[in-house]
């Protein structure tokens, strides 16, 4: 190989190395192919969070067909379910004089107060009827402790009480997680941030989520996730056989 040709070849090779440095080994031709060490986390796709529910996320039902499609690409799937007691501490109705979407101070810090939602055993708390994730091995219920809310699938809002999900995933050899569901700026974001902090390579599939967007919370969530190294992708970035 002539000197000029060799120089061009080395420069091109170096450029490819730099471009690919931040991508997983399974990323080829612009697509991610989840392997046996990847897990899909489906967050709170429940009747309470879709139109007609007690805490509806705008267009929340639109995530269902997206999740159903990409779920086929995963051998490991975890589904979470918000599962509150009657009179839960996160409900505005529990606090005299408080209205939904106001805040209050609880023992673990500031808490957004919500309408009563996802109460254990009700149809409102059930998973969406059209959600089809046949490979799901675990349904993780969260938010069932009376005095503590739980946005994250990994840890409750007191930042002390683990749900056990991290240990479960690590025991199965999972290295990478893809987070989907409701709502982007609360339970999805908290789950993604905790996953990254706990050592998992973490992706949020944007078009498989929808947001509440309370006082700019969506923009803040994306900025925070980006700053912490959570990757933002679309469902079209995932290779589905």
Residue spans for each PLM region:
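N-terminal secretory signal peptides and thylakoid transit peptides that target proteins
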Residues: 1-17
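Active-site acidic carboxylates
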Residues: 27-143, 171, 175, 197-204, ...
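Glycine-rich anion-binding loop/nest that anchors nucleotide
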Residues: 174-190, 204-210
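Histidine/lysine/aspartate-rich catalytic loop segments that bind and position anionic ligands
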Residues: 133-168
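Short catalytic/ligand-binding loop motif for oxyanion handling, primarily in non-cytosolic enzymes
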Residues: 85-89, 148-149, 187-188
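Histidine-anchored nucleotide/phosphate-binding helix
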Residues: 189-197
């Amino acid at each position: 190989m002539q000197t000029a040709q060799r120089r061009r070849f080395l420069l091109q090779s170096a450029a490819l190395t730099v471009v690919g440095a931040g991508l997983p080994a399974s990323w080829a031709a612009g697509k991610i192919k989840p392997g046996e060490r990847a897990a899909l986390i489906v967050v709170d796709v429940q009747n309470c969070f879709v139109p007609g529910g007690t805490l509806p996320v705008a267009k929340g039902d639109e995530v269902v067909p997206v999740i159903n499609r990409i779920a086929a690409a995963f051998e490991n799937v975890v589904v979470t379910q918000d599962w509150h007691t009657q009179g839960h501490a996160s409900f505005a109705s529990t606090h005299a004089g408080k209205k939904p979407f106001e805040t209050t101070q609880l023992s673990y810090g500031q808490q957004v107060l919500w309408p009563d939602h996802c109460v254990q055993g009700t149809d409102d708390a059930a998973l969406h009827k059209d959600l089809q994730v046949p490979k799901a091995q675990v349904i993780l219920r969260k938010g069932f402790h009376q005095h503590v809310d739980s946005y994250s699938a990994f840890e409750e809002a007191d930042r002390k009480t683990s749900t056990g999900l991290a240990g479960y995933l690590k025991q199965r050899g999972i290295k990478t997680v893809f987070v989907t569901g409701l709502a982007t700026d609360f339970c999805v974001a908290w789950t993604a941030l905790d996953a990254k902090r706990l050592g998992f390579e973490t992706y949020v599939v944007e078009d498989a989520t929808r947001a509440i967007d309370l006082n700019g919370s969506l923009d803040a969530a994306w900025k925070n996730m980006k700053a912490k190294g959570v990757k933002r992708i679309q469902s079209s970035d995932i290779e589905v056989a």
